[in-house]
């Protein structure tokens, strides 16, 4: 009879810990099952209304990811707004220059949140389950094994369900032709050795107003792969760039 009671207790502990340890993974899988995309711009750019609809594009990528489809998507998005793409910067009314600085996997959670809801949570749950059911010396060892085994199962479940966020950071410069003469003062501090700087200044006169902003696009989904995130990140950037015009 006593043996049956211990067996039932260990079975109950195992079931409870398995359920609790899998809650975090299951919750993440449900909440993040659909791809969510968000794009933000650091600064608003206001362009003067103009009947001139020619645009020169210069799209660069200095990240370590392949973004080879970006140029074509930006071109199409701009054309869909009624603008003509030209290969001549001199004849274009607008210049759009973009550089993808970073396209990488980033976790939406803070570091502490990741630890407390990930592996740390599973191990803590295992120890808690073992402590509660270790009600006498004869069963404590066996129940400890059950609790730790359940915790390891929970860790495996958390490892299989990962909340993934890919973020693309792009710097944008828009140049707009104007009939006025625009004077630009350039100042650059160049590092000299380990303790010195050389300051260079120059002044130039042109016919363009220049505006700069940064666009941050994020794609979030459980177990997201970059191959799935890439096209939507490119689409979001192309849409944002075209909407500046």
Curated annotation (Swiss-Prot):
It comes from the Bacteria. Its main location: membrane. The keyword Signal applies. It is a lipid-anchor. Keywords: Cell outer membrane, Conjugation, Lipoprotein, Membrane, Palmitate, Plasmid, Signal. Pfam families: TraT. A lipid is attached at residue 23 (S-diacylglycerol cysteine). InterPro entries: TraT_complement-R. Residues 1-22 form the signal peptide. The keyword Signal applies. GO terms for cellular component: cell outer membrane. A lipid is attached at residue 23 (N-palmitoyl cysteine). It is found in: Cell outer membrane. Responsible for preventing unproductive conjugation between bacteria carrying like plasmids. Belongs to the TraT lipoprotein family. This is TraT complement resistance protein. It comes from Escherichia coli.
């Amino acid at each position: 009879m006593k043996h049956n009671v211990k067996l039932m207790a260990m079975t109950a502990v195992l079931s409870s810990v398995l359920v609790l340890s899998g809650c975090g993974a299951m919750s993440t899988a449900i909440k993040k099952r659909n791809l969510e995309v968000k794009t933000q711009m650091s600064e608003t750019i206001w362009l003067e209304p103009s009947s001139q609809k020619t645009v020169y594009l210069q799209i660069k990528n200095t990240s370590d990811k392949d973004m080879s489809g970006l140029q074509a998507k930006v071109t199409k998005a701009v054309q869909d707004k009624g603008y003509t793409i030209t290969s001549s910067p001199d004849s274009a009314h607008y210049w759009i220059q973009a550089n993808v600085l970073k396209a990488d996997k980033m976790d939406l959670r803070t570091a502490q949140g990741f630890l407390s809801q990930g592996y740390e949570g599973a191990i803590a749950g295992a120890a808690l389950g073992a402590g509660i059911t270790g009600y006498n010396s004869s069963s404590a060892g066996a129940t400890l094994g059950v609790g730790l085994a359940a915790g390891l199962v929970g860790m495996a479940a958390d490892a299989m369900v990962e909340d993934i966020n890919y973020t693309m950071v792009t710097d944008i410069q828009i140049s707009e032709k104007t009939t006025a003469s625009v004077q630009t003062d350039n100042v650059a501090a160049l590092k000299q050795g380990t303790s010195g700087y050389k300051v260079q200044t120059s002044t130039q006169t042109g016919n363009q107003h220049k505006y700069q902003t940064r666009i941050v696009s994020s794609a979030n989904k459980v177990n997201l792969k970059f191959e799935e995130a890439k096209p939507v990140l490119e689409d979001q950037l192309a849409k944002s760039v075209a909407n500046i015009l």
